[in-house]
């Protein structure tokens, strides 16, 4: 670990938590944010079509103290479908990278299209929740069954 804004492996979580004076739960959440960002960046479609923005973009890129509880993205171009089920499928394809690279299973648990915030909005907004399980967790081996994958 080199002063990262996120723990970059499961093995880093405990030390990152101590170094940043935070709970293990918060360190787990930060690690999963890192995992999700890696998954999105490793999938050709999401890499081209989703741009990280907001407090976590500042935290990740510039080690800013500003942070939020979610990851905010803007869609670039027409790569990302404006359809709940197609978006879920695309994100689940990207999240499959997590198990190979990070020993974490992850999938979209909830995808919901939000109403446009104002009439001038040009892009739709979605709320997406991701379920995850670490390899050492007791439910890791039946994650797919428990999450209807």
Report each predicted region and the residues it spans:
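Compositionally biased terminal segments of proteins
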Residues: 1-149
